[in-house]
């Protein structure tokens, strides 16, 4: 599920949706500018960074990771993501600031998947709709 959280000064929880409807896919808008759009090249780059990160030193329950272009932060992000034990992961929440508009609250996606060069990432639509309904 893709979430954007911002705390408002008044403490009010406000939410908006981004205009995508169920069944719609969001394109990889930064492919070829922030990371390779070639699946084999991208997989090779990510694998190289993860290999260079060394052994896992713990088991992450949450990760705070940079999200700039991979050429700037791929190696740093790999150290964080190396701590993930994939078989222990039930759900992934992506939290990030909006770089496009100023939000007074948070935005929830209504698209059902994100297209990436490595394949589609499916959104937990039930979890997303429950989050929207509860306004939390």
Predicted region positions:
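Intrinsic disorder/low-structure terminal segments
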Residues: 1-4, 113
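Bacterial Sec-dependent signal peptides at the C-terminal "C-region" and cleavage site
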Residues: 3-17
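Active-site histidine-anchored catalytic micro-motif
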Residues: 18-136
């Amino acid at each position: 599920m893709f979430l954007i959280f911002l705390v408002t000064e008044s403490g009010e929880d406000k939410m908006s949706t981004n205009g995508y409807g169920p069944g719609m896919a969001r394109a990889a808008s930064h492919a070829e500018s922030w990371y390779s759009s070639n699946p084999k090249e991208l997989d090779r780059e990510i694998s190289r960074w993860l290999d260079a990160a060394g052994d896992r030193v713990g088991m992450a329950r949450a990760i705070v990771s940079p999200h700039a272009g991979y050429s700037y932060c791929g190696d740093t992000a790999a150290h964080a993501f190396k701590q993930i034990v994939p078989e222990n992961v039930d759900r992934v929440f992506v939290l990030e600031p909006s770089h496009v508009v100023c939000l007074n609250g948070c935005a929830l996606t209504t698209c059902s998947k994100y297209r990436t060069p490595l394949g589609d990432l499916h959104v937990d639509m039930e979890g997303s709709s429950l989050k929207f309904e509860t306004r939390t």
